[in-house]
């Protein structure tokens, strides 16, 4: 009993000290100073935000008082708040006029511009006047998780890990990635300066009150605080991007919350508001299989790696950024003054024709803070596969997406074959077990694939397209070295759709000779390639020597330099690795009439040799990228990115936005089909754009 009495007296003494301190503080603040302070806050548009934050603090304190988990200091503060509330109620009539001018009374103060002196122990208030004379619209469109600390005064500080110590990353849901900072108690304001001709801009407020005006400041803040649950690409400074924009869906006949079955870190939903059909069954793959480095016998996986500590921002020290710049400079006219292209704050504003080299597994840079790791992090946006009115299945975004944002990759099975000048009409079947591929009757002219014909009623998501030049080098003012050998093309195929990738060549090596020998062993029956699981490799055959069925053809003109590629039929079992079986040694070509048709990006302007053709087949295995439709005015562009290997034949095919995309908009890209190239295969384009070319294949 005596201990309880002593403790109660001690607590009452603390209350008295707190009350006395508050009284002294109130005496030091004059009415004129208070009115001037609130005028500044009103002009800066901070009143609403301060009261919203105050309400969050009060709710937490309220809950702690109810469940008995409050600390002694929090009990004291609760009593002080109650006393002040009673006093405020008594003085309401007297101060009504003054309070009405200031709009509302607030508790928190903005952090001072100089914040490099004190430690960051208090995480609540704001007192920064960097947007004085402006109007702010606070964009808090989701439930904010407030700090667990009570309402305490804020002092100048040096930002560090303690600024975000109260954020629990495990509680963050898989939602709009641009909404994650708001869920972590950041505030997003739309700021417009009064009487200024400048347009509105976006301003972020960190939980400790620090203002973040652009992506550079965001990166600095995340680096100083050691934040590993937010990236600079989670922040958008575009006024066109609205965090509260969401897609409103009508009555769904068929729906699926995640067609990836938890393969992707973010669910890929499916919605059909038109009929009761579903997409054809396929195996969902997060990335293409097999990895490029395994096809290359694990040789020359990475040319260089870095050990940056600044987030890989300095091209003079980052080896990976230098690889991108060096490849780009080989095809750039230095007199044009075009600087190296690449990621800027984890966004890509325009395509890099020579490819991007991301930091790899051998690099020692921080995976979260590194600005040169984007595609390898996988799908981050909330995408939905939906049934369109006229084009079959398509893909749309469920939230606003900023310009230059990575959307997804095009994943599938990598198929290999050899284009041998001695083989005029046949190709090795992709299945070693002897599955017959249906022979295709149609043929095309030089450099065109022999494709099976499609009815005009088929959707864009099912059409076949030949994509010769994914990037317009002329639009970038580049001087392109045309490749002499153009027999080999790399293609993507989704259903019946094929996408040509610009090939990257290098001279024949010992590795390629070993690969040739392996293919000969497969042909002779010494080993086979199965397509049952990812872990399986070449295994001894169960039967004697088998011949491969020639279900696909290379069509060759009379000119030996002009060779056409064969089309892998959708009905064939084409979801495994397949190789060629050359009967004579490939020859290097330095001149070809095909140069006039297709500009190629090569690793060097010197002579190049024929190598294997690599096909990315998404007909039976793939990801959400296989559902992307064509548009003559697309909102996506294609970019080659080297992630798991620097071998030129195996880039990842990534899609990035070329503008701000609003929630519910279908995501499309241009197949780049040149009208008249394959007139027999052309069908009507249904993109509906004003610049529509009316024909695709």
From Swiss-Prot:
Chemical reaction(s) catalysed: N(6),N(6)-dimethyl-L-lysyl(9)-[histone H3] + S-adenosyl-L-methionine = N(6),N(6),N(6)-trimethyl-L-lysyl(9)-[histone H3] + S-adenosyl-L-homocysteine + H(+)
Skewed-composition ranges (Low complexity): 565-581
Compartment(s) of residence: Nucleus; Chromosome
Entry binding sites for S-adenosyl-L-methionine: 391-393, 626, 629-630
Database matches in InterPro entries: DNA-bd_dom_sf, Methyl_CpG_DNA-bd, Pre-SET_dom, SET_dom, SET_dom_sf, SETDB1/2-like_MBD, SETDB_methyltransferase
Domain SET: 381-672
Limits of the Pre-SET domain: 304-378
Binding site for Zn(2+) 1: 306, 308, 312, 318
Entry keywords, A to Z: Cell cycle, Cell division, Chromatin regulator, Chromosome, Developmental protein, Metal-binding, Methyltransferase, Mitosis, Nucleus, S-adenosyl-L-methionine, Transferase, Zinc
A GO BP annotation: chromosome segregation
Record GO cellular component, one term: chromosome
Binding residue positions for Zn(2+) 4: 632, 685, 687, 692
Disordered, as annotated region: 438-461, 529-605
Presence of keyword Cell division: yes
GO molecular function ontology, one term from the record: DNA binding
Enzyme Commission code: 2.1.1.366
Binding-site list for Zn(2+) 2: 306, 320, 359, 363
Top EC group: transferase
Protein family (similarity comment): Belongs to the class V-like SAM-binding methyltransferase superfamily.
Role description: Histone methyltransferase involved in left-right axis specification in early development and mitosis. Specifically trimethylates 'Lys-9' of histone H3 (H3K9me3). H3K9me3 represents a specific tag for epigenetic transcriptional repression by recruiting HP1 (CBX1, CBX3 and/or CBX5) proteins to methylated histones. Contributes to H3K9me3 in both the interspersed repetitive elements and centromere-associated repeats. Plays a role in chromosome condensation and segregation during mitosis.
Comment, domains: In the pre-SET domain, Cys residues bind 3 zinc ions that are arranged in a triangular cluster; some of these Cys residues contribute to the binding of two zinc ions within the cluster.
The protein's name in its UniProt record: Histone-lysine N-methyltransferase SETDB2
Organism: Xenopus tropicalis
């Amino acid at each position: 009993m005596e201990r309880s009495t002593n403790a109660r007296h001690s607590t009452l003494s603390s209350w008295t000290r707190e009350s006395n301190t508050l009284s002294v503080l109130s005496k030091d603040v004059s009415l004129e100073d208070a009115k001037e302070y609130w005028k500044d806050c009103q002009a800066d548009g901070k009143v609403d935000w301060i009261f919203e934050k105050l309400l969050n603090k009060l709710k937490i304190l309220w809950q702690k008082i109810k469940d008995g988990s409050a600390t002694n200091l929090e009990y004291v503060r609760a009593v002080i708040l109650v006393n002040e509330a009673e006093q405020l109620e008594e003085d309401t009539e007297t101060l009504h006029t003054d309070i009405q001018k200031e709009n509302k009374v607030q508790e928190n103060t903005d952090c001072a511009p100089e914040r490099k002196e004190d430690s960051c122990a208090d995480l609540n208030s704001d007192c920064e006047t960097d947007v004085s004379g402006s109007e702010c619209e606070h964009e808090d469109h989701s439930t904010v998780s407030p700090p667990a600390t009570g309402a305490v005064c804020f002092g100048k500080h040096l930002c560090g890990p303690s600024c975000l110590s109260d954020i629990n990353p495990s509680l963050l849901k898989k939602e709009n990635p641009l909404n994650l900072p708001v869920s972590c108690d950041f505030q997003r304001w739309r700021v417009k300066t009064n009487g200024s001709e400048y347009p509105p801009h976006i301003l972020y407020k960190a939980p400790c009150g620090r203002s973040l005006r652009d992506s550079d400041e965001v990166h600095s803040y995340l680096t100083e605080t050691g934040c590993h649950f937010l990236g600079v690409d989670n922040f958008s400074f575009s006024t066109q991007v609205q965090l509260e924009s969401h897609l409103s869906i009508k009555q769904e006949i068929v729906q699926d919350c995640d067609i990836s079955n938890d393969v992707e870190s973010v669910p890929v939903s499916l919605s059909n508001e038109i009929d009761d059909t579903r997409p054809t069954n396929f195996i969902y793959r997060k990335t293409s299989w097999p990895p490029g480095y395994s096809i290359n016998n694990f040789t020359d996986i990475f040319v260089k790696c870095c050990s940056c500590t600044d987030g890989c921002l300095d091209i003079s020290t980052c080896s990976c950024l230098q690889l991108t710049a060096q490849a780009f400079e080989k095809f750039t006219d230095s007199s044009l003054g075009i600087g190296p292209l690449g990621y800027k704050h984890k966004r890509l504003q325009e395509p890099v024709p020579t490819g991007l080299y991301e930091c790899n597994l051998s690099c020692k840079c921080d995976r979260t803070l590194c600005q040169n790791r984007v595609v390898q992090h996988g799908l981050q946006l909330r995408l939905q596969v939906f049934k369109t009115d006229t084009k079959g299945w398509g893909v749309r975004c469920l939230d606003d997406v900023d310009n230059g944002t990575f959307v997804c990759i095009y994943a599938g099975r990598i198929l290999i074959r050899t284009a041998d000048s001695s083989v005029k009409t046949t190709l090795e079947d992709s299945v070693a077990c002897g599955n017959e591929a249906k022979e295709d009757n149609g043929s095309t002219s030089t450099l065109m694939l022999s494709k099976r014909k499609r009815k005009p009623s088929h959707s864009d998501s099912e059409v076949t397209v030949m994509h010769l030049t994914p990037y317009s080098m002329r639009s970038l003012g580049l001087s392109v070295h045309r490749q002499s050998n153009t027999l080999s093309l790399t293609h993507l195929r989704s259903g019946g759709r094929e996408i040509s990738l610009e090939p990257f060549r290098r001279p024949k090596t010992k590795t390629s000779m070993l690969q040739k020998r392996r293919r000969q062993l497969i042909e002779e029956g010494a080993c086979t390639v199965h397509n049952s699981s990812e872990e399986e490799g070449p295994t001894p055959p169960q039967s004697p020597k088998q011949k491969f069925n020639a279900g696909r053809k290379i069509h060759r003109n009379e000119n030996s330099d002009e060779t056409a590629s064969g089309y892998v039929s959708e009905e064939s079992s084409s979801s495994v690795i397949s190789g060629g079986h050359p009967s004579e040694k490939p020859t290097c070509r330095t001149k070809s009439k095909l140069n006039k048709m297709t500009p190629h990006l090569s690793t060097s302007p010197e002579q190049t040799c024929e190598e294997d053709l690599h096909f990315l087949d998404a007909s039976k295995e793939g990801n959400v990228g296989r559902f992307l439709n064509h548009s003559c005015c697309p909102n996506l562009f294609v970019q080659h990115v080297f992630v798991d290997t620097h071998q030129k034949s195996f880039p990842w095919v990534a899609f990035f936005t070329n503008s701000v995309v609003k929630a519910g908009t279908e995501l499309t890209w241009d197949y780049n089909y040149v009208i008249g190239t394959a007139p027999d295969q052309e069908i009507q384009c249904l993109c509906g754009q004003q610049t529509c070319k009316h024909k695709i294949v």
